[in-house]
Structure formats: C-alpha cells, structure tokens
Curated annotation (Swiss-Prot):
Function comment: Activates KDO (a required 8-carbon sugar) for incorporation into bacterial lipopolysaccharide in Gram-negative bacteria.
Pfam families hit by this protein: CTP_transf_3
Organism listed in the record: Escherichia coli (strain K12)
Family under the similarity heading: Belongs to the KdsB family.
GO molecular function: 3-deoxy-manno-octulosonate cytidylyltransferase activity; magnesium ion binding
Metabolic or biological pathway, per its Swiss-Prot or TrEMBL entry: Nucleotide-sugar biosynthesis; CMP-3-deoxy-D-manno-octulosonate biosynthesis; CMP-3-deoxy-D-manno-octulosonate from 3-deoxy-D-manno-octulosonate and CTP: step 1/1; Bacterial outer membrane biogenesis; lipopolysaccharide biosynthesis
NCBIfam families, sorted: kdsB (TIGR00466), PRK05450.1-3 (NF003950), PRK05450.1-5 (NF003952), PRK13368.1 (NF009905)
A Gene Ontology BP annotation from the UniProt entry: CMP-keto-3-deoxy-D-manno-octulosonic acid biosynthetic process
Reaction equations catalysed: 3-deoxy-alpha-D-manno-oct-2-ulosonate + CTP = CMP-3-deoxy-beta-D-manno-octulosonate + diphosphate
Protein name, as recorded: 3-deoxy-manno-octulosonate cytidylyltransferase
Entries under PANTHER family matching the protein: 3-DEOXY-MANNO-OCTULOSONATE CYTIDYLYLTRANSFERASE, 3-DEOXY-MANNO-OCTULOSONATE CYTIDYLYLTRANSFERASE, MITOCHONDRIAL
Subcellular location as annotated: Cytoplasm
Gene Ontology annotations for the cellular component aspect, listed alphabetically: cytosol
Sorted UniProt keywords: Cytoplasm, Lipopolysaccharide biosynthesis, Magnesium, Nucleotidyltransferase, Transferase
Length: 248
C-alpha cells in the first residue's frame, strides 16, 4: 500500500527558536525525522517548511522540500498547501509526521497509513496507554476516549475519563482506560481539502487541539494503540537535552 509522508517543519517556536535545525548528535533534528520516515517505506517524503535554512538542511540530506507560507495556524493547514502544490489525487493516503519527533518509530508511521487504508474514515491516529497519575493530570499530555469500535469520542488536555471514586483516593496509578494521544495523523488528500474549508470550532480554540475540528463537523477519527511507544518529542530546551542523551 503506497502512502506519502509530509513533515511540517515550522521554523519559529516560542520555547525553542529555530527548532527544526537544533543539533542532535551532529545532525539537525529535521534530518533525524526525515531518516525515520524513510524507514517507513513511504512512496514519497516531503518536508513542508517556511524557512530557507530548513530547506537547505533537508536538501543537503537528499530530501524533498515544499516551501509553504509562514502564517498557517496548524500543521494540517500547512499540509493542505502541499497537497494543492503537488496536485495529489483525493484518494492519496498522507501521513502527517511532526517535525519535532526525531525518535518516532518507523513502524507506527506505517501503522497509521495501514489503519487509514483499511477504513472509510476521515482520519486515523494513534495513542498509548497511560499508567501513572502524573501523566493523566498533565495538560501537555493530550488524552483521548474511544467508543467500542476504536473511534474517538473526544480529545482533551483535561483528565478524561474522570475516575470519580479512585481519584478521590489520591492514587499514583490509573486504570486501564486512559490513553495519551500521539501527534501523528493519516488522512486522504481529499479529506485535507475539506478540513481546511471548515471554520475552526469553539472546542478547538478552547483546547488548542486541531483534531477537535474533525469531531465538531461530525467526521470520525479512528484511534489504534501504537505498536511501539515513541521516544521523547522536542518542545522545550529540557526535552532537547533529554533526546540528545537518549539518542547517543
């Protein structure tokens, strides 16, 4: 099954300026992400960026670049510009791999593509189990609750589901129904074209989670448990130091 990987790589970052180009053991972070994507078996890999320095780093590593506008509000909106510039057919399967995930396993990139291809659904994504209460209560860890068929009911930075009885006891661990969403998405190009024509939803603005736009407009998102747990993503200088140590 063929699929395309698009890696949004926005240069500006409040907490880590020039994030795609930060050095991780001798390579720019975006090159590490590119290498993981190559291991997935994708038919084509495109880095979507708004900065010439990022483009030069990717091209020096033999990668393909699509220059995009700097004013996109989300990664999916940046993907939509690439979809139009590359004139992908509506049924092209596209996997959105975040440009700040240098330790993402190639297996889960392929997993998202396969899951989408097997279903007539707007979007496919992944999650991993949460076992400790600290993560369950962390607003930077996005939680997701599912229906019986594995489709998302809601995504939130809040602690969902709320275990009314056990949380009152102040436990350090949580039960079996807690999942942390991973920021990797699969969609068909036609769905991306529809997504960007929808107005942002109120819930999306409150939670700052772009996937809530999909649920707001009545589309389904399939969520599978990831076959491998990805390593640390890079959002802060502290994350960067942790990743450098883990990748040595």
């Amino acid at each position: 099954m063929s699929f395309v990987v698009i890696i949004p790589a926005r240069y500006a970052s409040t907490r880590l300026p020039g994030k795609p180009l930060v050095d991780i053991n001798g390579k720019p972070m975006i090159v590490h992400v590119l290498e993981r994507a190559r291991e997935s078996g994708a038919e084509r890999i495109i880095v979507a960026t708004d900065h010439e320095d990022v483009a030069r780093a990717v091209e020096a590593a033999g990668g393909e670049v699509c220059m995009t506008r700097a004013d996109h509000q989300s990664g999916t909106e940046r993907l939509a510009e690439v979809v139009e510039k590359c004139a992908f057919s509506d049924d092209t399967v596209i996997v959105n791999v975040q440009g700040d995930e240098p330790m993402i396993p190639a297996t889960i990139i392929r997993q998202v593509a396969d899951n989408l291809a097997q279903r007539q659904v707007g979007m496919a994504t992944l999650a991993v189990p949460i076992h400790n209460a600290e993560e369950a209560f962390n607003p930077n860890a996005v939680k997701v609750v599912l229906d019986a068929e594995g489709y998302a009911l809601y995504f939130s930075r809040a602690t969902i589901p709320w275990d009314r009885d056990r949380f009152a006891e102040g436990l350090e661990t949580v039960g079996d129904n807690f999942l942390r969403h991973l920021g990797i998405y699969g969609y068909r190009a036609g769905f991306i074209r529809r997504y960007v024509n929808w107005q942002p939803s109120p819930l999306e603005h409150i939670e700052m989670l772009e996937q809530l736009r999909v649920l707001w407009y009545g589309e389904k998102i399939h969520v599978a448990v990831a076959q491998e747990v990805p390593g640390t993503g890079v959002d802060t200088p502290e994350d960067l130091e942790r990743v450098r140590a883990e990748m040595r």
